[in-house]
Amino acid sequence: MGKEIQLKPKANVSSYVHFLLNYRNKFKEQQPNTYVGFKEFSRKCSEKWRSISKHEKAKYEALAKLDKARYQEEMMNYVGKRKKRRKRDPQEPRRPPSSFLLFCQDHYAQLKRENPNWSVVQVAKATGKMWSTATDLEKHPYEQRVALLRAKYFEELELYRKQCNARKKYRMSARNRCRGKRVRQS
């Protein structure tokens, strides 16, 4: 009669989660009236997981592989909504970076030279601290650059939108000409 609502397939779980579910069921059978807090139970499970043999872990890994195959097969047949990313027009102007990002660009090389073994995350944290401790006077040049970049961006965006509208009008008039209709020029 009506459309059937197709539910999204249940996600696959790891071998450790399969072990957890099995261990939980065994624990409930052995001690049905005992309550164990989540933290304590998790600790027991992780200790047990580390102590079991590779042969036993292989059983759970096989279950996880089967579950993954099931999930992938169900996703192939799933017709529900999937998010599609909007394709970005390469001619569309890009938004200007923030004053903080300009600050990061200026200080990244310096921090990397001073600390060559730092990861990108560590450098980012350091620049974040530098920015938060910087005074308004130190931030002012970056904010001025951002203001200039923003003004330029909005000019380019306005020009881009005008060009897009002109292209749309041209396409519409061309389509109508192909159909033999006359288009009023305004």
Swiss-Prot record:
Cross-referenced SMART domains: HMG (SM00398)
Annotated transmembrane regions: none
A biological-process GO annotation: regulation of transcription by RNA polymerase II
Annotated keywords: Chromosome, DNA-binding, Nucleus, Repeat
Gene3D superfamilies: High mobility group box domain
Region annotated Disordered, chain positions: 77-98
Intracellular or extracellular location(s): Nucleus; Chromosome
Family indicated by similarity: Belongs to the HMGB family.
Protein's name according to its UniProt entry: High mobility group protein B4
Gene assigned in the entry: HMGB4
